[in-house]
């Protein structure tokens, strides 16, 4: 006999668990079943505790816009030390550390390069003459000029996305791209007040001492036992029979809410789609623990230099001021690239030494993980196909949510806001 559930949720990450909570609050008598392919919850919000270090799969910090959501999570994390931090981010440019974002801090560059950026900013191409930008690269040149684009924004983002910026949509990063016009850039040349943020979406962040998994545990707290089935991947969704198929069983459903990557969901449902438009990068993350403290008063550092293996380094130890340097180091690569992890770890350590982040430190613990997909490539073609596929699936009672279900660039809080709205509407 086929089992049934009012709602089948695919994925026990922030999006799936968030939806399960919102929906059960509105419909206490509903049967909600969450299917998770992995042995543990969290998706990419997993935490590794090793040799006294606490690492996430990568730096998953919450940047709350809605006090209601922050309060909801905090109420379900009793006893957990949670710190709200004013972010300090630096860019390592030609051996000089300047504040993030680059475009608002060009006055910190050596004089000749500052003047170069300023002149190119003033004489940047105009959209009134050249028309609206057709790509992310064109948007950068039109908005910020040649020098700012080519000194930082182009090399950094191409290291991250592992793709030419001409292929990305002009609004590929949405609100996450630090906006700055000429007036902003000039105004930022005034001395900053102590403790002032950088004006970015994540100028402050919130982080629990136990790592990002604490947010997942908060979302699990109110769900009844048996709500989440682990080690149970979905292999097919039979839209005609309205059944979800796993290696263990068939489950009849009223509706499906999926946080799986959209092209995977399209394959599971047999819905026609253009797989070629759904491209992404992958990110190799090294979590590195050292025997003693290193840099202080920095949380992120960005590296546009293409000769440096990584594009970003983050310091966990500077959030809670612990006494041993604890880093996450991120390397971008095209989807499908193969990693020689040992060789890359050695290269990363060499680059950290050359950049002065590591000197005579001893590496005492390490971990790595590959995120694939990591950053999706938002293109004009992917936007159209994403909308078409999601709309078609929704008509069949299958709703695709989250960063990868929406094939977009968004925050964890955005996923909770999105799934709360969906729970209220279906």
Tell what function each PLM region has:
Residues 96, 113-239:
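Active-site/ligand-binding neighborhood in enzyme catalytic cores
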Residues 51-128, 175:
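Dinucleotide-binding Rossmann-like beta1-alpha1 core, especially the glycine-rich loop
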Residues 44-47, 101-102, 313-426:
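Conserved flavin/dinucleotide-binding core of flavoenzymes
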């Amino acid at each position: 006999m086929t089992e049934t559930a009012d709602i089948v949720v695919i994925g026990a990450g922030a999006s799936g668990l968030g939806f399960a909570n919102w929906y059960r609050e509105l419909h206490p008598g509903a049967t909600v079943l969450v299917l998770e392919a992995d042995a543990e919850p969290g998706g990419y919000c997993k935490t590794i505790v090793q040799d006294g270090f606490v690492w996430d799969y990568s730096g998953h910090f919450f940047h709350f816009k809605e006090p209601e959501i922050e309060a909801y999570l905090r109420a379900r994390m009793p006893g957990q030390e949670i710190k709200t931090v004013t972010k300090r981010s630096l860019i390592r440019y030609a051996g000089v550390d300047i504040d993030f974002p680059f475009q608002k801090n060009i006055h910190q560059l050596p004089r000749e390069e500052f003047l170069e950026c300023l002149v190119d900013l003033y004489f940047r191409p105009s959209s009134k003459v050249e028309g609206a930008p057709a790509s992310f690269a064109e948007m950068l040149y039109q908005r910020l000029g040649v020098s700012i684009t080519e000194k930082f924004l182009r090399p950094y983002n191409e290291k991250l996305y592992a793709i030419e910026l001409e292929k990305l949509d002009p609004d590929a990063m949405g609100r996450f791209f630090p906006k700055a016009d000429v007036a902003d850039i000039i105004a930022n040349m005034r001395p900053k007040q102590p403790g002032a943020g950088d004006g970015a979406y994540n100028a402050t962040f919130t982080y629990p001492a136990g790592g990002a998994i604490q947010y997942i545990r908060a979302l699990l707290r109110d769900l009844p036992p048996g709500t989440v089935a682990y080690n149970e991947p979905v292999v097919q969704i039979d839209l005609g029979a309205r059944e979800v198929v796993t290696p263990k069983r068939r489950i009849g459903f009223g509706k499906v809410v999926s946080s799986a990557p959209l092209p995977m969901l399209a394959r599971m449902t047999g819905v026609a789609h253009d797989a070629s438009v759904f491209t992404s990068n992958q990110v190799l993350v090294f979590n590195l623990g050292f025997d003693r403290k290193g840099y202080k008063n920095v949380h992120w550092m960005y590296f546009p230099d293409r000769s440096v293996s990584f594009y970003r380094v983050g310091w966990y130890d500077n959030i809670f001021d612990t006494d041993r340097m604890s880093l996450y180091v991120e390397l971008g690569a095209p989807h499908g690239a193969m990693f020689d992890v040992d060789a890359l770890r050695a290269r990363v350590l060499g680059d950290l030494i050359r950049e002065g982040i590591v000197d005579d430190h001893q590496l005492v613990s390490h971990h790595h993980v590959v995120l694939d997909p990591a950053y999706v490539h938002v293109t004009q073609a992917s936007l159209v196909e994403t909308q078409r596929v999601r709309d078609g699936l929704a008509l069949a009672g299958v709703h695709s949510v989250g960063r990868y279900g929406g094939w977009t660039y968004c925050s964890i809080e955005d996923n909770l806001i999105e799934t709360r709205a969906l729970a209220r509407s279906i």
